[in-house]
């Protein structure tokens, strides 16, 4: 077709061997301008059809709109003005020896700088004036450089010879070899294309696609033969020539220009002779693909081969075109774009006037237009490469845009910005617009195959034709793809001017070509891309062209090349092909134009001659819709010449193109004759293909457009990158889009695609709207979504493989675009953080690739090596079972009886072990005997105070159960009135305070005796009446509430702390009463006098203020769990009349909720008026209790807590009764009106009513006087008068327990403390909480009560419940529970309600030897009363004792038989494996419970004789007697905590202080103390306690008298004595060995439980306290890998082995005891172990009853080792052993020195060495060891 103008201008020499043309012998230099001759003659066209066809002359140049004031100084004839340095030579053709030089136009034409010259007009001028032969070179890619050189030096255009015969043959061959053509096309572009060629090719492709889409039908017919010929003959030469052209690029540049003159008539005749076999112009083979697929492939090659070599037959006539350059016409007014004005013939004449006349006046524009009516003209443009294109001003640009009234295209989908688009060349625009045209050109390869003359004609035709096309796009601009608006308008103007003025267009084209030498390559590349894109779709071609444009802009090579467009025209079948010149803006930005050889890429040389084909976007789309056009780009690089021109040739006029043709009728009138000819030849084909297109458009319509919208653009970009990587030596690589090779029938497919594109652009506006300029700004991600919606399956698409890959790329790009869009508003810092996180995640993923991905369906992967590891080689580890990972299907199995259960016959046990749930009530005599037993076990416990209270509570509970039993049936009935009447009747009884009645028993011992007697009688008489089954009812009341203390006197232990709390609450009560009186007085005074008594008020206020300042409103109670903190608060509050609001850890207690619930209660003291509910506690709860579902079918006997009494349900409430406001939110909404008696009765719940009835019964039982009721009423009235109004008290339980939901809890507590007018009590079990919690509060410390008293208390409870228990069991239980009263009581309830323990026959145990005969009792009268019944004692049947409470707690009954005692199990000799396993299991259980069973009970389980040493002062020895009472002992415990209320040490305690431990006891557990350590009586160092005991006890004294040390020397030992000593030492050695082993185990195996205690155990030896939070990190992690169970098992095994060895050794040693006795020497006394009574009673763990001595020792240790001198010591146990004895000796010595008063001023030794130990500690060290 049309050869590249730059190549033609460069006049690259044709290879001599191929074309028989003499090579150029001299390379034109920049300064070699003398050779340029002015074209003085015109070669008149053969036919005058051009005159007929072309419309009246119009301004041919778009520069008319942008032209600035002409520069008179510029003279077109001056050659010096255009001197430029030679750009790097670029070979245009593939032929190795392109030696025919091109004669460049005369220099005077190119001296006009900054003037746009239309190429076609220049060609016309050249033709007419100078008839200088223009040679069209076949060089493809690298001829551009040569062209540029030639153009710089010469002003003559030489047309290449083209051989018609060869073309005909090549066409036939091309039919046979269409596929080879495409494959070669693929190869050639890579080898022989420069980057400029790439750009040109892309542009051409698009222009050709747009122009060709309509001409496809005709072009197909023509292209099939032509392509064949081209393929067969030119494919190989093109490849070889491309390689040669690369190698000989410089040689071609150096060759002199040789002109081959061909008679134009002969050329046209020969051309017409071979219509079907169109002359394969050097560009033709490259430009003409047999099918769209080939076209695409050949696009790149065709671009390169734009100047394909002419076939070797060079005898064809040469066409010599003489063109004269005309001066540019006068500047027109810029206001009205001349594109809309039809130019008249005079304008044409003016444009054709002699350029010399007008040169000095203004810029010259010359359009050389060669008009051939039926032949396609090859426009040969020459220009001076030196000229640079001036940029138009903003005004001109805006005017141009306004003229077209089309918004500038937004950034295209390929990402180009507006500024880039502004710089785009018209060629680029035309490329975009010419997507369809380029496709059409590809489809019409015949158009591309044009002889040199045909190319000139086609140029003329193109110059005239764009006008027609430009009109169409204007009308349908919205539907067409457009590049920059300015470029579009320029293209349109150029087209119109081309129609009007062929000559002018020729001149302009020549000037433009001069301007755009360097852009030849660019246009080639663009057109090549267009060709490639043509196959895919017009849209893709647009995108690719844009990419190429960007590349061409970015790389500006100052080469000016002459572009010669060759078109082989099959007779008149081919219509005008309008070639537009590239956009001037792009020319300015990048100076390397590229010529596109559209169609066949086989003959790359021919590609050079093919003009750049592009179309304006509108024209492109309209042409696609209605007509197929061949668009050729005429590039002009000269500043003084017109901008780029597009030449369009309309191939066919399908039906669809009627509208567009009508719109452009005015412009097409002159071309009608040629159109008719073209239509006549291609009418049938076009119709047939239209039908095919329409049929398949419905199927493939949407999919193609989708595919070509974005993906191909990106694919072209990626391919361009890959091409650059492959050919780094080339600046701009040709982007080759390879599609699957197509057969000869592929033109139909390409037509189908184009037709489909027409449908998309014309009919389916929603799809084509993506290309509308106004919508260019839409992000590609949104466009992609639309395309996905419109997706239709694609059928028979050549580029389907490309689309699939490009769609995936598009998805990635869309995702990135979406992410970038969403992150566009983020700050940089956040972006960096996100990027850093993403990078870290990538690194982590990369690192973790070796690990299996976690899948929640099946974690195990059988193929993974990790699941098939080899078994370990260790023989001990090879016996593991195989891991069975198979999941069994349970549905397949039928569960049968016995499969998961076994039926074992229960062995007949002792009938004594039968479980019984209920027991008969004890008789009076039995109860008294058991009370005597309890009294003897612990004489210090006051039975007279606790037993009556507990018994009354039990009777009350029984009556409650009876009341529930009576109301069981009415409860289930829906009748409310009946239940209400019953409640009222029950509630009418006198309401006496429980506390008052309970206190009646403590009025005096005499009253208590009488009442207990009466009570015993009553119970004994009613044993038959009271059904024992009533206890079997479901008991909903815990014993901790059932036996809850109602008075402060009922509490056990902590007497001082309770008194302090009671006094504090009493002060608050007094303060509240004073404030209440003040308020009442103020109101009365206001009512009566209206004026307050100032003096009284001020006095009262002052007193109240003083009291308020004195009183702290908050008390913090600390102490271990279960010692009675909360019970003490409730007891004191109930005694003093406080209403308690409890907030415990069981409810959600966030700060906001607490403040909202309690804000009313915190503002006043009084919270309730006088009434029944005044003393009921209120619990903080988030949930509405009244709305909770009621148990309708609850058991008959349900007993609830008297303290935590839930509100009655609506069903059980009366009509006038409202729900009790238990929730704090509703509490303050209670009406303040006083209730009548009926209302009070109605407000009482069932439980309350029953309780009152039970109280009434108890009153009747306890009081027999007739006026008892009146007295009780008086008492109640007095008590209620004291508590008219309940004072509020808020209680926060467990303030140290804070959950995640309790946000702001402590802050809310602090707010209450700061703002409330009521007392606040906080309880906590954390001793360090007071250090962490900030605030003003008083601290009250509760400690562990006396273990013996608690044990006696539990025995009394069991006695009240009709159970006889063993005191030793309770001591053991409390020892295991750390004396937790609540826990022990709850477990006791569970144990008793489960049936109790093992029943054993056991006589009464008494503390005296003579207790069997007479019961020694205390001074209580009750005991005297029992003594009076002494004669009946022998006749009373004592109940059997329930034992095994502690064993049941530890589950030992499951290990040993129920009847087997634990100590018997330990003493039993192990003979079987089962027994050994039992022993290990028992020891393990105790180790898990942190109990050292063997060490604690060693003296009992060893086979040594044991002697229990009773103390003279009591059954439990000295430590018990020192505590005259439980309160005294508790005083010792709380002395160091309650500093403000110190207790004096009892004198007895001071007198009896003894040193009973040596230093070895310092590192014991602290629970053991010296008197309880196992010690052999013959020990050399006897303790003081033992000496005292021997002195006091005559029996012990006589036994051990022989072993007392004597001052006199003893006689030598006899044989018997030696033997006895050996026996004793052997036993001692065994025992010491066992202790050594135990010590080693303790050191080796650390207790895992200690590490879980937040590390506090590490600080127990110092005074330091660990604040909460400092050791939290250790709480979640166990450093010791040994689990508690494993560590316990290991320790138990070692301990059992060691103990078994020790026991067996001692047993063997004792076998020789008889032999010693035979020698009249009995070592039994020496082997006997003396054990105190309390040590003997305790089991499992040594008693914690008296911890004073241990506490004193620990206090000394903490004080000493907390000083700075000892803080750095490591092992604390070793430090204690090393330092403490020495420090004690020093302190004693210093104490003696101080007493002797040797010096006037005594300086202690520790002060001299600056050892900072407190004076109190020094005094303690100097004293005897505690």
Curated annotation (Swiss-Prot):
ATR may stimulate the RAD9A dissociation. GO terms for cellular component: Elg1 RFC-like complex; nucleus. Residues 445-456, 540-559 have a biased composition (Polar residues). Residues 469-481 have a biased composition (Basic residues). It is found in: Nucleus. Expressed ubiquitously in all cell lines like teratocarcinoma, cell lymphoma, lymphoma. CDD domains: AAA (cd00009). One of its GO terms (biological process) is negative regulation of intrinsic apoptotic signaling pathway in response to DNA damage. It holds the Pfam family AAA. The keyword Nucleotide-binding applies. Residues 365-381 are annotated as: Interaction with WDR48. Residues 298-311 have a biased composition (Low complexity). Residues 170-254, 282-311, 323-367, 398-572, 588-623, 647-684, 709-729, 965-1034, 1183-1216, 1527-1552, 1592-1611 are annotated as: Disordered. ATP binds at residues 1119-1126. Residues 243-254, 418-442, 459-468, 487-505, 1006-1019 have a biased composition (Basic and acidic residues). InterPro entries: AAA+_ATPase, ATPase_AAA_core, P-loop_NTPase. The keyword Ubl conjugation applies. It comes from the Eukaryota. GO terms for molecular function: ATP binding; ATP hydrolysis activity; DNA clamp unloader activity. Has an important role in DNA replication and in maintaining genome integrity during replication stress. Involved in a RAD9A-related damage checkpoint, a pathway that is important in determining whether DNA damage is compatible with cell survival or whether it requires cell elimination by apoptosis. Modulates the RAD9A interaction with BCL2 and thereby induces DNA damage-induced apoptosis. Promotes PCNA deubiquitination by recruiting the ubiquitin-specific protease 1 (USP1) and WDR48 thereby down-regulating the error-prone damage bypass pathway. Component of a heteropentameric replication factor ATAD5 RFC-like complex composed of one large subunit (ATAD5) and four small subunits (RFC2, RFC3, RFC4 and RFC5). Within the ATAD5 RFC-like complex, interacts with RFC2, RFC4 and RFC5. Within the ATAD5 RFC-like complex, interacts directly via-N terminal with RAD51; the interactions is enhanced under replication stress. Interacts with RB1 predominantly in G1 phase via its LXCXE motif. Interacts with RAD9A in growing cells. The interaction with RAD9A is reduced after exposure to DNA replication-inhibiting agents. Interacts with BRD4. Belongs to the AAA ATPase family. This is ATPase family AAA domain-containing protein 5. It comes from Mus musculus (Mouse).
């Amino acid at each position: 077709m049309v050869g590249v103008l730059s190549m033609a201008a460069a006049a690259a020499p044709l290879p001599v061997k191929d074309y028989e043309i003499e090579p150029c012998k001299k390379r034109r230099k920049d300064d070699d301008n003398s050779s340029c001759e002015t074209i003085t003659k015109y070669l008149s066209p053969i036919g005058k059809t051009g005159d007929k066809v072309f419309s009246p002359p119009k301004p041919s140049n778009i520069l008319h709109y942008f032209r600035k004031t002409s520069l008179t100084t510029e003279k077109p004839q001056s050659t010096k003005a255009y001197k430029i340095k030679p750009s790097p030579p670029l070979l245009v053709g593939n032929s190795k020896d392109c030696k025919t030089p091109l004669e460049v136009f005369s220099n005077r034409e190119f001296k006009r700088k900054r003037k746009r010259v239309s190429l076609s007009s220049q060609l016309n001028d050249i033709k007419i004036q100078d008839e200088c032969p223009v040679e069209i070179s076949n060089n493809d890619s690298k001829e551009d450089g040569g062209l540029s050189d030639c153009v710089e030096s010469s002003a003559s255009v030489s047309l290449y010879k083209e051989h018609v015969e060869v073309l005909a043959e090549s066409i036939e061959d091309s039919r046979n070899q269409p596929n080879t053509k495409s494959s070669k096309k693929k190869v050639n572009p890579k080898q022989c294309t420069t980057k400029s060629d790439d750009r040109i090719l892309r542009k051409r492709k698009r222009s050709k696609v747009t122009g060709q889409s309509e001409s496809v039908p005709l072009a197909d017919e023509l292209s099939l033969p032509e392509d064949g010929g081209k393929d067969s003959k030119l494919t190989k030469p093109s490849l070889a020539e491309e390689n040669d052209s690369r190698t000989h690029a410089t040689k071609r540049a150096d060759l002199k220009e040789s002109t081959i003159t061909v008679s134009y008539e002969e050329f046209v005749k020969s051309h017409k002779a071979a219509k079907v076999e169109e002359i394969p112009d050097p560009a033709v083979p490259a430009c003409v693909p047999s099918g769209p697929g080939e076209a695409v492939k050949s696009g790149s090659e065709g671009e390169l081969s734009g100047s394909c070599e002419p076939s070797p037959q060079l005898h064809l006539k040469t066409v010599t075109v003489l063109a004269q350059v005309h001066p540019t016409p006068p500047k027109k007014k810029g206001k009205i774009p001349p594109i809309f004005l039809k130019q008249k013939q005079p304008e044409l004449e003016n444009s054709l006037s002699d350029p010399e006349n007008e040169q000095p006046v203004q810029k010259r524009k010359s359009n050389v237009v060669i008009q051939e009516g039926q032949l396609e003209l090859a426009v040969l443009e020459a220009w001076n490469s030196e000229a640079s294109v001036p940029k138009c001003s903003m005004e001109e640009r805006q005017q141009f845009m306004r003229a077209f009234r089309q918004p500038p295209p937004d950034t295209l989908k390929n990402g180009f910005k507006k500024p880039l688009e502004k710089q785009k060349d018209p060629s680029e625009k035309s490329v975009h617009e010419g997507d369809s045209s380029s496709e059409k050109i590809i489809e019409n390869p015949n158009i591309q195959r044009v002889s040199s003359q045909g190319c000139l004609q086609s140029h003329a035709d193109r110059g005239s034709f764009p006008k027609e096309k430009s009109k169409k796009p204007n009308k349908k601009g919205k539907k067409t793809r457009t590049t920059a608006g300015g470029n579009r308008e320029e293209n349109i103007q150029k087209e119109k001017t081309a129609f009007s003025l062929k000559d002018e267009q020729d001149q302009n084209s020549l000037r433009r070509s001069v301007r755009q030498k360097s852009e030849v390559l660019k246009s080639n590349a663009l057109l090549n891309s267009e060709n490639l894109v043509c196959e895919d779709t017009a849209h893709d071609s647009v995108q690719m062209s844009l990419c190429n444009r960007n590349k061409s802009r970015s790389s500006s090579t100052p080469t000016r090349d002459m572009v010669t467009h060759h078109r082989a025209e099959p007779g008149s079948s081919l219509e005008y092909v309008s070639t537009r010149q590239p956009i001037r803006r792009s020319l300015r930005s990048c100076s390397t134009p590229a010529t596109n050889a559209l169609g066949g890429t086989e003959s790359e040389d021919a590609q050079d001659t093919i003009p750049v084909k592009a179309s304006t976007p509108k024209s492109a789309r309209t042409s696609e819709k209605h007509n197929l056009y061949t668009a050729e780009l005429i590039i002009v690089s000269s500043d003084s010449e017109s901008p780029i021109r597009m030449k369009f040739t309309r191939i066919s006029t399908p039906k669809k193109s009627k509208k567009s043709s009508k719109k452009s009728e005015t412009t097409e009138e002159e071309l009608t004759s040629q159109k008719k000819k073209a239509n006549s030849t291609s009418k049938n084909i076009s119709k047939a293909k239209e039908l095919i297109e329409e049929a398949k458009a419905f199927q493939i319509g949407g999919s193609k457009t989708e595919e070509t919208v974005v993906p191909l653009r990106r694919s072209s970009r990626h391919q361009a990158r890959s091409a650059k990587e492959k050919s780094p030596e080339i600046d701009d690589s040709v982007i080759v889009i390879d599609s699957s090779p197509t057969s000869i029938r592929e033109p139909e497919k390409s037509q189908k695609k184009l037709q489909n594109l027409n449908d998309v652009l014309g009919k389916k506006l929603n799809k084509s709207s993506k290309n509308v300029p106004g919508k260019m700004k839409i992000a590609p991600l949104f466009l992609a979504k639309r395309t996905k919606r419109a997706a239709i399956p694609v059928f028979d698409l050549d580029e389907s493989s490309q689309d699939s890959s490009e769609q995936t790329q598009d998805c990635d790009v869309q995702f990135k675009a979406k992410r970038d869009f969403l992150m566009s508003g983020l700050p940089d810092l956040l972006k960096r953080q996100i990027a850093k996180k993403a990078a870290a995640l990538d690194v982590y993923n990369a690192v973790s690739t070796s690990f299996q991905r976690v899948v929640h369906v099946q974690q195990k992967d059988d193929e993974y090596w990790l699941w098939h590891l080899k078994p370990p080689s260790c023989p001990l580890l090879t016996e593991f079972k195989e891991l069975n990972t198979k999941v069994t299907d349970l549905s397949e199995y039928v569960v049968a009886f016995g499969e998961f259960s076994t039926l074992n016959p229960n062995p007949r046990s002792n009938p004594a072990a039968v479980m019984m749930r209920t027991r008969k009530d004890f008789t009076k005599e039995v109860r008294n005997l058991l009370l005597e037993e309890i009294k003897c076990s612990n004489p210090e416990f006051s039975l007279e105070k606790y037993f009556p209270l507990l018994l009354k509570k039990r009777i009350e509970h029984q009556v409650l159960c009876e009341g529930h039993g009576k109301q069981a049936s009415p409860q289930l009935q829906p009748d409310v009135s009946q239940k209400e009447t019953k409640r009222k009747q029950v509630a009418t009884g006198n309401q006496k305070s429980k506390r008052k009645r309970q206190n009646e028993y403590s009025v005096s011992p005499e009253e208590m005796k009488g009442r207990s007697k009466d009570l015993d009688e009553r119970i004994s008489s009613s044993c038959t009446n009271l059904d024992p089954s009533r206890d079997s009812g479901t008991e909903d009341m815990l014993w901790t509430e059932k036996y809850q203390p109602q008075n402060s006197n009922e509490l056990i232990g902590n007497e001082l702390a309770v008194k302090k709390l009671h006094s504090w609450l009493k002060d608050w009560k007094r303060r509240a009463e004073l404030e209440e009186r003040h308020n009442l007085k103020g109101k009365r005074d206001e009512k009566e006098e209206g004026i307050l008594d100032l003096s009284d008020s001020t006095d009262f206020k002052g007193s109240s203020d003083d009291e308020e300042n004195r009183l702290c409103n908050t008390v913090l109670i600390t102490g271990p769990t279960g010692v009675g903190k909360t019970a003490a608060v409730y007891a004191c509050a109930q005694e003093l009349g406080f209403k308690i609001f409890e907030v415990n850890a069981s409810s959600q207690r966030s700060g906001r909720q607490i403040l909202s619930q309690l804000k009313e209660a915190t503002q006043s003291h009084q919270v309730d008026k006088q009434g029944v509910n005044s003393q009921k506690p209120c619990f903080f709860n988030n949930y509405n209790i009244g709305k909770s579902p009621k148990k309708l079918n609850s058991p008959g006997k349900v007993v609830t807590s008297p303290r935590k009494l839930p509100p009655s349900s609506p069903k059980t409430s009366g009509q006038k009764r409202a729900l009790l406001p238990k929730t704090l939110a509703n509490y303050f909404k209670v009406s303040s009106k006083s209730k009548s008696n009926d209302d009070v009765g109605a407000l009482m719940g069932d439980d309350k009513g029953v309780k009152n009835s039970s109280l009434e019964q108890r009153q009747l039982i306890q009081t027999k006087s007739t006026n008892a009721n009146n007295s009780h009423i008086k008492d109640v009235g007095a008590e209620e008068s004291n508590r008219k109004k309940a004072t509020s008290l808020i209680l926060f339980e467990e303030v140290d327990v804070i959950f995640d939901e309790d946000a702001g809890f402590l802050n809310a507590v602090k707010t209450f403390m700061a703002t409330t007018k009521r007392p606040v009590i906080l309880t906590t079990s954390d001793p360090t909480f007071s250090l962490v919690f900030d605030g003003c509060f008083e601290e009250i410390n509760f400690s562990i009560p006396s273990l013996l008293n608690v044990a006696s208390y539990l025995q009394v409870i069991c006695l009240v419940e009709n159970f006889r228990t063993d005191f030793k069991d309770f001591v053991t239980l409390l020892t295991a529970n750390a004396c937790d009263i609540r826990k022990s009581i709850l477990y006791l309830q569970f144990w008793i309600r489960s049936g109790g323990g093992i029943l054993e026959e056991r006589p009464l145990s008494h503390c005296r030897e003579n207790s069997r005969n007479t019961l020694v009792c205390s001074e209580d009268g009750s005991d005297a009363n029992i003594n009076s019944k002494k004669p009946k004692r022998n006749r009373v049947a004592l109940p059997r004792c329930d034992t095994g409470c502690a064993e049941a707690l530890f589950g030992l009954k499951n290990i040993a038989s129920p009847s087997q005692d634990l100590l018997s199990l330990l003493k039993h000799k192990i003979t079987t494996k089962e027994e050994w396993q039992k022993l290990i299991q028992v020891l393990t259980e105790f180790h898990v419970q942190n109990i050292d069973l063997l060490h604690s009970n060693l003296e009992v389980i060893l086979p040594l004789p044991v002697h229990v040493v009773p103390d003279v002062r009591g059954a439990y020895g000295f430590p018990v007697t020192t505590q005259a009472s439980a309160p005294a002992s508790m005083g010792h415990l709380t002395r160091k905590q309650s500093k403000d209320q110190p207790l004096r040490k009892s004198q007895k305690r001071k007198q009896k202080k003894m040193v009973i431990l040596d230093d070895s006891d310092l590192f014991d557990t602290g629970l053991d103390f010296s008197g309880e350590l196992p010690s052999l009586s013959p020990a050399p160092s006897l303790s003081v306690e033992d000496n005292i005991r021997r002195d006091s006890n005559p029996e012990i004294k006589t036994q051990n008298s022989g072993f007392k040390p004597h001052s006199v020397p003893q006689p030598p030992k006899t044989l018997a004595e030696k033997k006895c000593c050996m026996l004793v030492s052997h036993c001692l050695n065994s025992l010491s060995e066992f202790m050594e082993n135990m010590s080693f185990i303790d050191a080796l195996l650390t207790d895992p439980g200690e590490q879980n205690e937040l590390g506090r155990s590490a600080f127990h030896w110092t005074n330091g306290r660990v604040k909460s939070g400092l050791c939290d990190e250790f709480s979640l992690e166990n450093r010791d890998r040994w689990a508690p169970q494993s560590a316990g098992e290991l320790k138990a095994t070692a301990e059992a082995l060691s103990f078994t060895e020790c026991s067996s050794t001692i047993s063997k040693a004792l076998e020789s005891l008889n032999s010693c006795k035979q020698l009249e020497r009995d070592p039994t006394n020496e082997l006997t172990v003396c054990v105190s009574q309390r040590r003997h009673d305790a089991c499992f763990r040594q008693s914690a009853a008296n911890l004073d001595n241990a506490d004193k020792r620990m206090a000394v240790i903490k004080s000493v080792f907390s000083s700075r001198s000892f803080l750095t010591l490591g092992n604390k146990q070793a430090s204690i052993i090393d330092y403490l004895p020495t420090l004690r000796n020093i302190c004693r010595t210093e104490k003696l020195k101080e007493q002797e008063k040797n010096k006037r001023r005594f300086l202690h030794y520790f002060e001299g060495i600056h050892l900072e130990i407190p004076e109190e500690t020094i005094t303690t060290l100097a004293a005897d060891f505690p």
